[in-house]
């Protein structure tokens, strides 16, 4: 089982991830983290996500380094992600990032860190955006260099 921490666990994507992890036979939710002060802190992450209780309470900080964790999935804020990547680097944890609005210097830092720890980063994981990108890719293969494809 791959042990996953979801950062931004009470948000829309975080809740969807927790639901998906619950349905997976190869993934296990090990930690659900969100912003300090949210009313969901201390609540069961399964219940917050609209599924049955899973016993993983939403916390406002990553578990201690001694806790067994295989990967971090971050759908937080740009500021939080900038801090989270440093924690993942320190702990040598792979991270998947779906946070939007990262500053250029943070993206540069991600590129450097990716030589040390595995990083998957996309600004947008929505189905609509990814379907559009796939359609543009297909159109460019069909039309080749004869047309200029632009998304407005």
Predicted feature residues:
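N-terminal Rossmann-like NAD(P) cofactor-binding module of classical short-chain dehydrogenase/reductase
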Residues: 72-73
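N-terminal Rossmann NAD(P)H-binding glycine-rich loop of SDR-like oxidoreductase domains
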Residues: 10, 14-18
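Short acidic low-complexity segments
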Residues: 54-68
